[in-house]
Amino acid sequence: MERLMIEPLTAEAFAPFGDLIDVLGPPDRLINAGLCGRHHDLARLDFDAEGRAGISLFDAQARTLPHVLDLVERHPLGSQAFLPLDGVPFLVCVAEDADGVPVRFRAFLTAPGQGVNILRNCWHGVLAPIGAPGRYAVVDRIGPGANLQEYPLPVPLLVEG
């Protein structure tokens, strides 16, 4: 089994696959009579013309490290954002595409409270909270059409921290 090492999650490192969603620095603007800071437009949400943005709640079972990555998926009709409700860190495995096959895998681990938006058509692992079960608000495409493609890996990867 090949090994895949977890690398630091930064906006720059994750940019080819999506967006890091985090409260970094001061807010972009103050709202509600100055009592609330708004960190504005943190993700490149992208849905086809027949879909719309929807919010779902996911309740995911805990995983541990090292983690066996044996299945990835992608969503050709829309992006998918994961926002932790419990502050549980989660593993984010992503890959480039080569003619419908995931290649050049990378792995990241969120810090408590960080979320990610995964771009449309980007191969990624399933939701994997590390160390404890996690609940997540997920913003993704709701609508007609096949928006899920799964790819079982012929040779699983062992993700290590």
Curated annotation (Swiss-Prot):
It comes from the Bacteria. Its EC number is 4.3.2.3. Keywords: Lyase, Purine metabolism. This is Ureidoglycolate lyase. Homodimer. Its cofactor is Ni(2+). GO terms for molecular function: ureidoglycolate hydrolase activity; ureidoglycolate lyase activity. It catalyses: (S)-ureidoglycolate = urea + glyoxylate. GO terms for biological process: allantoin catabolic process; purine nucleobase catabolic process. The lineage of its organism: Bacteria, Pseudomonadati, Pseudomonadota, Alphaproteobacteria, Rhodobacterales. HAMAP family: Ureidogly_lyase. Signal peptide: none annotated. SUPFAM superfamilies: RmlC-like cupins. It holds the Pfam family Ureidogly_lyase. Pathway: Nitrogen metabolism; (S)-allantoin degradation. The gene is allA. Belongs to the ureidoglycolate lyase family. Catalyzes the catabolism of the allantoin degradation intermediate (S)-ureidoglycolate, generating urea and glyoxylate. Involved in the utilization of allantoin as nitrogen source.
